[in-house]
Amino acid sequence: MKTPASLESLITALRVLPGVGPKTAQRMAYHLMQRDPGGADRLARAIDHARSHLKHCARCNTFSETELCVLCADDQRRQDVLCVVEMPADALMIEQTHSYDGLYFVLMGKVSPLDGLTARDIPLEQLARRALDGTVNEVILATNFTAEGEATAHVLATLFKDRGLSVSRIARGLPVGGELEHVDAGTLAQALYERRRLSTGDA
């Protein structure tokens, strides 16, 4: 039996989600159409609303509905420490540790040579402007301990070499190959606390 074109289009669209293969996308599509049509409507409206209202924070590059996100607009946060993460979910995980009160910069990506993603695919110029605006004394590199995260940290360390900033890397208490969003709060808090300063030779 041939799948209707509109249903096939929905299945294909759902496959853009990370970790969703053909079978999972098919199950999702059937569920939305048969068992939860109201949910399908809410999902469509929520996606449309998010696309219409979300933009990037002018300072940290995370998603925000205003020019500055909630954290960047909070003058009670430390202004002299900047933690660089790959994705908004990573910053959220660090916030949940309640062990960091500085600010963030979200790359919205990473360096991944195998995927054809180079340093030109992350906002290095915007990050440099933010880190070198005169208020930041320390940059914490909190990219994942994956091959891509390490490559990204190397690029960032090179960027800030000889710029007069203290550059540190979160400690290797995190498992090799581990991603921040999957690490428990206690382990992540300890990794932040035990962060090591990078020397010129590390860049």
Swiss-Prot record:
Q: Which UniProt keywords apply?
A: DNA damage, DNA recombination, DNA repair, Metal-binding, Zinc, Zinc-finger
The stretches annotated as zinc fingers (C4-type) lie at 57-72
Q: Tell whether Zinc-finger is among the UniProt keywords.
A: yes
Q: Show the Pfam families listed in the entry.
A: RecR_C, RecR_HhH, RecR_ZnF, Toprim_4
GO molecular-function annotation terms? DNA binding; zinc ion binding
Q: Indicate the segments forming the Toprim domain, all copies.
A: 80-175
Does this UniProt record's set of keywords contain Cell membrane?
no
Q: Which GO biological process categories is it annotated with?
A: DNA recombination; DNA repair
Cited InterPro entries: DNA_Rcmb_RecR (IPR000093), Rcmb_RecR (IPR023627), Rcmb_RecR_Znf (IPR015967), TOPRIM_dom (IPR006171), TOPRIM_RecR (IPR034137)
Gene3D superfamilies given for it? 3.40.1360.10, RecR Domain 1
Q: Which family does it belong to?
A: Belongs to the RecR family.
Per its UniProt record, what HAMAP family does this chain match?
Answer: RecR
Summarizing the function annotation, the protein's role is:
May play a role in DNA repair. It seems to be involved in an RecBC-independent recombinational process of DNA repair. It may act with RecF and RecO.
NCBIfam families from the entry?
Answer: recR (TIGR00615)
The record's listing under PANTHER family reads: RECOMBINATION PROTEIN RECR
Name the record gives this protein? Recombination protein RecR
Q: List the source organism.
A: Laribacter hongkongensis (strain HLHK9)
Q: What lineage does UniProt assign to this protein's organism? A: Bacteria, Pseudomonadati, Pseudomonadota, Betaproteobacteria, Neisseriales
